[in-house]
């Protein structure tokens, strides 16, 4: 699979993911993981999922029971335009992301290829960057720190200790 993050990882196909036990069902949970059994000079084998179907107006919900934490991990759940080679044209929305445990909370973001800004947001988090242009702020886009009502429990060890959480997004292309 394509490595859009340019990280030290080898994304494997479905047969290899099954063979290496990197993705599987466990009761009501779907597990995705990285191979921790061997060191690889080009990065550890892991999985990356993408939808075969595209969505426009929609509600997307992710219930997560556990996120990996620590140095050299970059767990994320995001949406991107179906024209990925033209990124950031069409945009990207990061619903759940935090690389290398840099922050104690989840970081949501929007990346677009035009001038766009977050103004007067109705949110419980804190606006870290208000410019959504994908090339501004070291490619951070508009970034919101999810540190509002349940500070610290939106990411990492605190999220895992409370048994996980839910991230949801309504995508609506109508004006307003």
Give the residues covered by each predicted segment.
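Mixed-charge, polar/low-complexity N-terminal
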Residues: 41-42, 152-153, 169
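Glycine-aromatic-enriched beta-strand/loop faces of beta-sandwich-type recognition domains
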Residues: 88-160
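Localized edge beta-strand/strand-to-loop motifs within extracellular or lumenal beta-rich domains
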Residues: 161-176
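Low-complexity, Ser/Thr/Pro/Gly-rich disordered linker/stalk regions
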Residues: 1-101, 105-109, 118
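Eukaryotic intrinsically disordered and solvent-exposed regulatory patches
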Residues: 46-48, 153-155, 164
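Short, glycine/acidic-rich beta->alpha junctions
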Residues: 54, 69, 85, 150-151, ...
